[in-house]
Amino acid sequence: MSSFIADKIVMDGLTFDDVLLIPAYSEVLPKTVELKTRFSRHIELNVPFVTAAMDTVTESQMAIAIAREGGIGVIHKNMSIENQAREVAIVKRAENGMIYDPVTIQTGKTVADALAMMAEYHIGGIPVVDEENHLMGIVTNRDLRFERRLDKKIDEVMTHENLVTTHQQTDLTAAAQILQENKIEKLPVVDKAGHLVGLITYKDITKAKDKPMACKDEKGRLRVAAGVGVTFDTLERMQALVTAGADAIVIDTAHGHSKGVIDKLREAKASFPNIDIVVGNIATGEAARMLADNGADAVKVGIGPGSICTTRVVAGVGVPQLSAVYDVYQALQGTDVPLIADGGLRYSGDIVKAIAAGGSCVMIGSLVAGTEESPGDTIIYNGRKFKSYRGMGSLEAMEHGSKDRYFQADTKDVKKLVPEGIAGRVPYKGTVQEVIYQLVGGLRSGMGYCGAATIDKLHEAKFTRITNAGVNESHPHDITITSEAPNYSRPND
């Protein structure tokens, strides 16, 4: 005899508060664990954190901050193609081993031109070149600081005598020595014919020493990804982002297991075979295999777990996050396709669980939305500082460009949009560096308890299912908290 349970219920759905990791024999100290992992098939991370492609989470400032900590940010798409490409370019220029395409100014230009370029690119010096890109000199803000004639030719104020340069084979250690010996901050790199081929700055060398865990490409630039939707101009947007230097493209939709998304994935892989394409969001192993078979370089897992997402309530659809992550992890065995666990993370312990269930890394939104580097508006409420945070399925975000993520791109009337998210505020949390420090600390601690020296070893950890009483027991209880911890707040605070 058939029944609803026998015929319709195909799996138990568990999420973070339903389970705990079982401690195991360990020879691993938290400070010695290895956090290296992968974001996508060809992109490694030094910490398993990815900031979400949300318009109140990740623009260039956030992407720079998370990359310096060892993760990667995904620039959101709720802006014009030009502006999104510019945000990517800002990240790629933020740090360099050697700047391979430095901003230059041609001889004959004026002081006003140089000042405008310095303001636009936030730089303090510009190499001066002729029409054939021969290095003629360098102009810095020191040269221009007291110059009153804005129409004066740059040739008259630039430094050109005794100009210190180096060749392409110079490593950063040797470059640092040259900079120190000559008391200069910028070192032009030229070829044998005197053509400018790059620029090494003292600031970049200092940053590299200060942030040895930073996530960088083979040229020493910070890595960054960028989100796109499934629209008529997706390939045009991708082209602009790739040209700007994006290390990966994330096809970001509410339902990645759909024909339109898979067709766009195929187009993207055909048009950009040398760049990693990440696709999401999904919640089943079947979806993961289909995306992997069609060329996805990573998949993003999570339908409805986010704090600002209402998909499960509005549409009645989703899979509790830990079950979804494990189902996808099992399906991807043998494919070399990493899994990004996206959403539902409130504490560092949730991150440990998400990775133990099969995640290669986690995508974070609310955990960093309250930081200094997030683009959300700062709000003062009842004497406390907050930052705005909204789901990309909220009415406000959909009005600004995320309608296509929820397959409503053709809906012109705002009143006819069906949102799958809300807008709100989160407490101000300080800097990204401070937040990531605590999250990394919690992850290291969890790995130590499980005896897992690496992310891959953490995948072998076992869980125990708990009751509501177990959840209550897990949190501080029978006490009034008088001093807040930087990594804990009560549920629903």
Residue ranges and their predicted role:
Residues 61-64, 236-244, 277, 283-301, ...:
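Catalytic cores of alpha/beta
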Residues 31, 80-89, 147-151, 195-215, ...:
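Active-site-adjacent beta->alpha loops and helix N-cap segments on the catalytic face
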Residues 33-45, 52-54, 83-121, 128-130, ...:
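Bateman/CBS regulatory modules and CBS-like beta-alpha motifs in cytosolic regions of diverse proteins
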Residues 68-83, 246-258, 297-315, 345-379:
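Glycine-rich phosphate-binding active-site loops on the catalytic face of alpha/beta enzymes
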Residues 1-25, 105-106, 167, 227, ...:
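Alpha/beta catalytic cores of nucleotide-metabolism and tRNA/nucleoside-modifying enzymes
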Residues 44-51, 97-102, 161, 217-227, ...:
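Short beta-strand/loop segments at the ligand-binding rim of alpha/beta enzyme cores
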Residues 74-78, 104-105, 125-127, 165-166, ...:
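Catalytic beta/alpha-barrel core
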Residues 75-80, 123, 127, 134-150, ...:
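Short beta->alpha transition motifs characteristic of CBS
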